[in-house]
Amino acid sequence: MDTKGLILNTAYNDFILGSNISNYLYKNHTKEVYNELTFTNSSYYFYDDEINIWCDDDGKINTIRCASSCLYQGVELIGLPFQELLSTIHILPNNHERIYLLVNGRGQNQHVYDFETIGLQVWVWRQKIKTVLIYKVVEET
């Protein structure tokens, strides 16, 4: 897949949600494994794309995290005022919460907005987008 940027509920650049991480390990990356009580999570950082990829136990990509750049339909989302995103996607978030983070040793109350119908989570501080997470929406049967 030769795309650039975010395709909602599908991909970022050539990283496709649901595909196996082994398809991308030729790219310059680092890997970390987090062993939690109930699950193990593998996280990869890809230097050239400047993204984090989180995978299921079987190596399938479940989440893509963009914090330095995230193009959507030619618009840079990182740094974009949140209201402009709402005007662009024409969807309101399903959920909102405030999460306290330490960033460079200083505290930030970031607003986290979930757009569950399109597989998007947006972290906002001072009304500007700081981080975008992309995930595949799984239809419940």
Predicted features and spans:
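Short helix/turn-capping signatures at newly exposed starts of structured segments
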Residues: M1-T141
